[in-house]
């Protein structure tokens, strides 16, 4: 009797031990298609790691950034794996809020990751996030509509040429809009696109003494061009459209042209989700007076907050989701063209290049993007479509709201730029610039 009770107790404790050993990781990510695919394929990870369970929190881009910023700044500890970009990796890594991505397995082959991507996610040589995909920006256009109109897209178009094409191809009565661009307010939404437009017109966020330049001729020309072109030749409600909204519009055949992230290449050519999959052309992002900073550099990456109590398990998952093995899994289940792009040299095999008609332009754009030299003028900051200082998140969000207001006609462009100049100057002084 005593022996049976003892065995029963031992069995219960063993069962309890197994239950306790299973760790649940809370993964916060953005509602982009590549991440939705990662969530779906993560069942493979859980099968290989029965001691790790995944709890997914999938959010719209602006909401994700707000949630993660609040949680990590307060050391809230809600999440074990964060989907962040180069901006957060640099700043949060420097503050000691992220666990270093050291001691990765040899099979991870970190040397295979593009140096510019590694550097963008590192601080003083220490890597703080593993890149899931990396992107630049490029131009997508409807080859059939260009042919019908007798137009030819140059390999390196100017924004002025883009506006001319948009005017000729804009047929709102047929729900065919000349150009689709980001209008949704957010430092990583409309301001990513707007800043590359401004760079192309020769503008910069700050001069060498950290003084904003929004009322200067370059920003004035760029802002007027952006608001005028998108208001005249864009879809209705453009101020509500970010990356995902414009992707849906393009895939439904409603955009003659679209300038946005290179990562969209696999989606616009996917017949299962794009009505125009066989009618898409690809070329470089537009320039104007300069090509410096005309195409951005960005990476969505997986990081681990120091507040996580399950760092080892979190690193195991992050390494799996950003590995060559994961890329091979995607190629097997969804086709080689859908492999997360922009992070690894090995991705760009002959097979991938043949299957992905957008890959050549995307790869060249990634390699040419230089965050250390984003403007024709000298700048005190690093970043093409953003400024890598802690204050930029708040400033960029506020500026984005004002650009969206100008786009909806709530205020003239000059008035908007004056307001932006004043608010940005005030915030920079409050933060103690110049430093």
Language model features with spans:
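Extracytoplasmic "Venus flytrap"/periplasmic binding protein-like
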Residues: 40-116, 120-122, 148-150, 157, ...
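Extracytoplasmic/periplasmic solute-binding protein
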Residues: 124-132, 137, 161-212, 219, ...
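Conserved C-terminal helix/tail region of periplasmic/extracytoplasmic solute-binding proteins
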Residues: 53, 147, 371-435
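Hinge/lid segment of periplasmic solute-binding proteins
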Residues: 85-136, 160-161, 178, 190-193, ...
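Extracytoplasmic "Venus flytrap"
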Residues: 24-41, 59-61, 135, 385-391
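C-terminal lobe and pocket-closing loops
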Residues: 263-276, 288-397, 435
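Glycine-centered hinge/linker elements that transmit conformational signals in sensory
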Residues: 165-168, 209-240, 281-286
